[in-house]
Regions:
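Active-site neighborhood of HAD-like aspartate-dependent phosphohydrolases
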Residues: 2-49, 53, 57, 181-182
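Short beta-strand segments
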Residues: 15-17, 110-114
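Acidic donor-diphosphate engagement hotspot in glycosyltransferases and nucleotidyltransferases
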Residues: 25-27, 94, 115
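Short, acidic loop-to-helix structural element flanking the phosphoryl-transfer center
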Residues: 63, 82-110, 149
Length: 205
């Protein structure tokens, strides 16, 4: 989606979402579930629960999360899957090149992501492109998940940003709408090509 703010505007900060914008999740390898393949729906549903959301917010730790598992879901299987998830994440090559281009143009780059505490350290070890960011704020550090306005407010405060100097890119429209409530302009990511054209039209490239 696009907002109705004037087309030509000077932005100095570009804020990126991580998942489904810069990186993608690959399916779990078939050998991970093995004989427990039938439990996959239960496992996937657990990742959508309030308990897992609280884990991503840093409200509960991994041990507390494990204690909330459905009885039919073995702890060992859950732990194996948790370790595998960050290894299944792969960057979108053209988006990483775009990051590098924006950095070379002098923009300050920020990352705002809903992510589990165990995942981010692995991604930081795997992906050097994360070093391009001038600041990173995770949901577990903010104790809030997008689209909660709290996480956007904290980003602005923590890095001393002025909302009208920022342009936000996220794959979920609800997150863009939340950011706009604080005066942060943005666009919903659908593809590299669409984003590139949008940035060109906004005079960001």
């Amino acid at each position: 989606m696009k907002n109705n703010l004037p087309t030509q505007h000077t932005y100095t900060n570009i804020i990126f979402d991580l998942f489904d914008v810069l990186v993608l999740h690959s399916p779990l390898p078939s050998n991970i579930l093995g004989k427990d393949k039938a439990l996959e729906p239960t496992l996937m549903n657990f990742f959508k629960t309030e308990a897992y959301a609280n884990y991503k917010k840093g409200v509960i730790n991994l041990q507390q999360l494990t204690e909330l598992l459905p009885k039919e879901l073995p702890v060992s299987l859950f732990q194996t899957v948790l370790k595998q998830i960050p290894l299944n994440v792969q960057p979108i090559p053209e988006m990483i090149k775009l990051l590098e281009l924006l950095k070379s143009r002098g923009y300050r780059l920020y990352l705002l992501t809903n992510v589990a505490p165990h995942t981010m350290p692995v991604l930081e070890q795997r992906f050097s492109f994360l070093q391009l960011f001038d600041g990173i704020l995770t949901s577990f550090d903010a104790r809030a998940l997008k689209p909660d306005l709290k996480i956007f407010q904290l980003l602005l405060e923590q890095f001393g940003l002025k909302s009208t100097d920022c342009f936000f890119i996220d794959d979920l429209e609800k997150n863009i709408l939340a950011a706009q409530q604080l005066g942060i302009d943005g666009t919903t990511y659908t593809s590299y090509e669409a984003l590139y054209n949008e940035l060109k039209s906004r005079f960001l490239l």
